Amino acid sequence: MAGRAYRFPRATRLKRRRLIRPLFDRDRDDVGTVAVGCVRLLFRTVAREETGYDTPVQIGFAPGRIRGAVVRNRVRRLLREGYRVRQHVLVDRFQQRPDTLTVMVLFRGREEAASTCIPRDLPKALERLAARFMP
């Protein structure tokens, strides 16, 4: 779309431990998951005041247990770029809502296949996640 800004400001980055830890707690009922190919999304909604920012979506990226910092950072960059270009799928859904969607994107594939499977699987996963929050 012509008028959209495809930015990824710091306020949308999921950095606080108290927001990240509940996403990985298996005993919680309010955490959902979407898995498509090599990408898994963990998500939950929280009150906007709890995040510290007035942003509709906060997202973090975990490349998994990839050996070597260069390859791990490359996978993280691919995940961030894939989300940045398609972020409006989620942001538009949560713009008018009083809560914030917190998402952790996990890469669960082979590092050699990252450059092909992330652009293929991440958009599908984001679409499935957005479909869960249809009005």
Where are these regions (language model features)?
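Positively charged, solvent-exposed patches that mediate nucleic-acid binding
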Residues: 1-135
